[in-house]
Amino acid sequence: MQPNITGHNVEITPAMREFVTAKFSKLEQFFDRINQVYIVLKVEKVTQIADANLHVNGGEIHASAEGQDMYAAVDGLIDKLARQLTKHKDKLKQH
């Protein structure tokens, strides 16, 4: 899984790209059939926002998180996506 990372009003540094890629690779332990990942990191005034769209088998998953810095926003985003992926996996098992 290679995430597609874009920035709005923020420059994506190599360190940030590496951090995000490492965090998103951990999501595969929750659901291994993630096809595509689109991540948007943006800054609105003083708020750092991280959005993600995941294309998975059986649908799409979207999450958004805010933080005081971009690293905190990405951590919050990963937590939300992990919960959603676990729920999605359980739904697929029930059918």
Regions found by a protein language model. Name each.
Residues 1-95:
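N-terminal, polar/charged subdomain of small-to-medium soluble alpha/beta proteins
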